[in-house]
Amino acid sequence: MNKQAKILLQTTIPHTEDDWHVGRFSLLAEHLRSLSDEAGNPLYDVTARDREEEPSGIDPLLSALDESEFDQLWLFAVDAGDGLSPADCAGITRFRKRGGGILSTRDHNDLGSSLCTLGGVGAAHYFHSKQQEPDPSRHSRDDNVTLNIDWPNYHSGANGDFQTIKVIDHELTRRPNGTLIEYLPAHPHEGAVGIPPSVEEASAVAIGTSKTTGRPFNLIIAFENSVDPYGNLCGRAIAESSFHHLVDYNWNPETGCPTFVEEAPGDEYIRTPEKLDDVKHYVANAAAWLTRGD
């Protein structure tokens, strides 16, 4: 039997029913578990987990992730800025330094800004109060409908709809037939990601376009393997502008959302479910790519 890669799907909040807890990523987990090799053997052993906190304020798994058997961490930063302790970030950083693959994603404004202290991939995430986008002209609202959410808040469409994207030819962006993916789930206020200065191994592989301003913005930044100054071969990594590309509500709005979500959902995926294939191809590509780095 093949050796399954072990994937940890992890949020940065304790389980809270009326929030983006890990149970709201069940369609993603189901899809990853359905992927198999040519002999029909499952490729991935998937664990889905919300943050757990000891009295000291650390998460016992994340703070020692480098000592675990996991091969990949898919980290959904759904916190308001305090979702990862310094010890958690250190454990995750060591995990990548020992070759672990990381997919990191967040959302608008400062949502998920605990990612800033992650080594390497954390520098690709831009927020409102800290680690802002390098271009000052982008320090302004893009989405002008949901007025209680400040920048970065790129409007790519309604939850439940899809956005048409631009991609480069990359292992992450290819369909099984060799053509390139064209669609990802839309969101009214995506966050901001970019290539950190002097990081040659990073590239923007998918770009969206705001439906309100027409501005292009990065959706996916891919980090190839790299050797750090201490000789560690760091695993591959991905920085995404919004966890809404992967959450159940954006794949199927009939699954529901927390009560604080104000915007009415769209129905494009319900009417044209075949468009959802592209994000599923991306997910399969990401799992394979993060596993394969060497």
What are these regions (language model features)?
Residues 23, 40, 57, 81-83, ...:
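Residue-identity detector for glycine
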Residues 24, 33, 49-51, 94-98, ...:
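Arginine residue identity/basic-tract feature
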Residues 6-121:
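Helical hinge/lid and interdomain linker segments adjacent to catalytic or ligand-binding clefts
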Residues 15, 21, 31, 108, ...:
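Histidine (H) residue identity feature
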Residues 21, 45-64, 113, 117-143, ...:
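Surface-exposed intrinsically disordered loops and tails
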Residues 1-34, 69-74, 112, 204-294:
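Extracellular ligand-binding/catalytic regions of CAZymes and related secreted enzymes
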Residues 10, 80-179:
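A glycine-rich, often tryptophan-bearing local segment used as a flexible ligand/cofactor-contacting loop or short
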Residues 58, 132-241:
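Catalytic beta-strand/loop cores that center a nucleophilic Ser/Cys/Thr
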